[in-house]
Amino acid sequence: MRLTPKEYRRLSHRRITLLGMSGVGKTFLSNMLRREDWFHYSGDYRIGTRYLSEPILDNIKAQAMQVPFLRTLLRTDSIQIINNITVDNLSPVSSFLGKLGNPERGGLSLTEFKRRQALHHEAEVQAMLDVPDFIQKAEILFGYPHFINDAGGSVSELESPEVMKTLAEHTLIIYIKASEQNERELIARAERDPKPLYYREAFLDEQLTRYMAGRDLEYVAQIDPDDFVRWVFPHLFRARLPRYEAIARDHGYTILSSELAQISSSAEFDVLVEQALAREGAT
C-alpha cells in the first residue's frame, strides 16, 4: 500500500503491518495502540494458538511422559495439559522451536530442529495470510476502526511472494529499523539471554558449517545450544537487515526505533507515519 501523508491523514480505518527484529518496539507500540481503538493482531499469538497449538502440546506431553508420575496420570487421562499462550506470553512458541545441539543440555538433533523450523515457517506464512480476514473481524465483529499487525521478526525470512502481496495490498507496511544503539542492545540481550530463533534453511546450513569448523566439532550433538545462539545472532541480525530494507523499499516505509521510542500516543504515531511517508517520496 502506497499513500501520501494527506491520504493517510484522511483514512477512517488505518491498517498497518509492523516489521522488524524482535526487540525494536513492535509489541510495545502495538500494546500502546491497543488502548486507543486499534485491534492488535499478533502474528506469533496466531501461530501458537492456531497453527502450532497441537505440536506445542505434543512436545510438552512428550517431556511430561518422561516423568513416571506424570506419565501414569497422562495415560489414564487424570490430568490435562493446555497451552496458556497470550499476546504477552508467547514462551510456548519459542520453547517449541527449541535450540540446536547437545541433548543433555536441552538441544535438538538437526533433523528434529529442521522439522520444527519447517512447521514454524508454514505456520507464519498462514498467520500472515490470515491478516485480511482479521482486518474484517476487527472492524465488523469487534468494532475496532484501526488494525495493527504485529508481525514476527522472521517474516523477512519467509520468501513468500504471496505473503508480501497480501500484506502490501491490505496494510501499510512500516519497517522499524534498529538504531545503532538499539542494534548493540539487541546483540547484548542475545548474549545475556539466548532465545530460540527461526533461520532460513540455507542460512542455517551455512552458519552451522562455519560454527562447527570454528569450534572444531564433528557432530551437532557436541554443540552447546546457548553458545550457538549467541554466536549466530549477530550474523542473523545482519543477514536480515537487507531483507527488511528490500521489503520497505518495494512495499512500504521505514521509521527508526529511536524515533518510535519518543512517542506515547496513537496521535504521535500517526505523525511519525506521516513523516515517513513524506521523506520517502510521498508528498
For the regions a language model picked out, list residue spans one by one.
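Hydrophobic anchor at the beta1->P-loop junction of P-loop NTPases
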Residues: L18
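The conserved Walker
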Residues: S22
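Conserved glycine(s) of the Walker
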Residues: G25
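Hydrophobic positions on the alpha1 helix immediately C-terminal to the Walker A/P-loop
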Residues: L29, L33
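Short beta-strand-centered segment that lines the nucleotide-binding/catalytic pocket of NTP-utilizing
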Residues: D37-L52
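ATP-dependent small-molecule kinase phosphotransfer cores
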Residues: L52, L57-E162
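Conserved phosphate-donor/acceptor-positioning beta-strand/loop module used by diverse small-molecule
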Residues: D150-A151, T166-Y219
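NTP-dependent small-molecule kinase module
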Residues: L217-T283
